[in-house]
Amino acid sequence: VITSYFGRRNTGIRGASTYHEAIDIANSYGTAIYAADGGTVTYSGWRGGYGYLVIIDHGNGYQTYYGHNSSLVVSTGEHVYKGQQIARMGSTGVSSGNHCHFGILINGTFVNPLNYL
């Protein structure tokens, strides 16, 4: 279930941006999070408001972000394939409930993930 869409939004969470550069997909705590495509994990760890975050570089200027995880199952530098589990859903960082903050960065600019799914 998508609980927050890409773009401007009203949020009651202190410290949360009013421009959302991703979509939020909600499910139960611990739900498996899978890589949208194959690539190399360039970041796997804690990053402020994102909480536990995984970033995958897919090449050609294309990266995906997976934030607010409860735990991570991949490490920086690891090669992953499309559909491989990379994390477990949670509510870490600046978050109001269990969800995956899913973002797509193309050539340094976040784009609406719904245009690519």
Task: List each model region and its residues.
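Catalytic cores of peptidoglycan-degrading enzymes
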Residues: 1-117
